UniProtKB/Swiss-Prot annotation:
InterPro entries: Ribosomal_uL6-like (IPR000702), Ribosomal_uL6-like_a/b-dom_sf (IPR036789), Ribosomal_uL6_a/b-dom (IPR020040), Ribosomal_uL6_bac-type (IPR019906), Ribosomal_uL6_CS (IPR002358). PROSITE patterns: RIBOSOMAL_L6_1. This is Large ribosomal subunit protein uL6. Belongs to the universal ribosomal protein uL6 family. PANTHER family: 60S/50S RIBOSOMAL PROTEIN L6/L9, LARGE RIBOSOMAL SUBUNIT PROTEIN UL6M. The keyword Nucleus does not apply. Gene3D superfamilies: Ribosomal protein L6, alpha-beta domain. Keywords: Ribonucleoprotein, Ribosomal protein, RNA-binding, rRNA-binding. The gene is rplF. Part of the 50S ribosomal subunit. One of its GO terms (molecular function) is structural constituent of ribosome. It comes from Magnetococcus marinus (strain ATCC BAA-1437 / JCM 17883 / MC-1). HAMAP family: Ribosomal_uL6_B. The keyword Cell membrane does not apply. GO terms for biological process: cytoplasmic translation.
């Protein structure tokens, strides 16, 4: 039994959820998301709640149960409230700026790094070192933030680089003579 899969997904007002077999479409004020689920997963909508069930008893089916429920919940929350992540830049001369749909990063390279934001995402920069990325698709948001961070991940000696706000970076001691 999946503890997460047993919980029903509550659909708030303003979100239109359409279930067509294994294809689920959520439409809200922020956008529209469509996802194809595994054929072992079934959905039952009762009013403002959606219950996720699994048809098989094998290990793969039961492992997909909680995942499918969480993915459905992320779709509903995303189109109604949206998600956001914050990245901070640490280092002398490291800064960021938004120009249209492009995030321009100065990360110590001989050239600026230009990152084109995917559709459905928007970024704002505060104090030149704090980037806030917002969107309604949690997967696209996480992937975009991981790509931004991958240009200059935090290094363990001085801590310079791009990191998530609140991320702990293990610091190392320098070489001793």
């Amino acid at each position: 039994m999946s503890r997460i899969g047993k919980k029903p997904v509550v659909v708030p007002d303003g979100v239109d959820l359409k279930i067509n077999g294994t294809v689920v479409t959520a439409k809200g004020k922020l956008g529209e998301l469509t996802r194809q689920f595994h054929e072992a997963i079934t959905f039952a909508q009762e009013g403002k709640e959606v219950n996720v069930a699994v048809s098989g008893t094998d290990k793969k089916s039961s492992s997909l149960w909680g995942l499918s429920r969480t993915l459905l919940d992320n779709m509903v929350v995303g189109v109604s409230q949206g998600f956001s992540k914050q990245l901070e830049i640490q280092g002398v001369g490291y800064r960021a700026a938004v120009k249209g749909r492009t995030l321009e990063l100065s990360l110590g390279f001989s050239h600026p790094v230009n990152y084109e934001l995917p559709n459905g995402l928007e970024a704002t920069v505060e104090k030149n070192t704090l980037i806030t990325v917002k969107g309604y698709d949690k997967e696209v948001l996480g992937q975009a933030c991981a790509e931004i961070r991958s240009w200059r991940p935090p290094e363990p000696y001085k801590g310079k680089g791009v990191r998530y706000v609140g991320e702990f970076v293990l610091r190392k001691e320098g070489k001793k003579k």
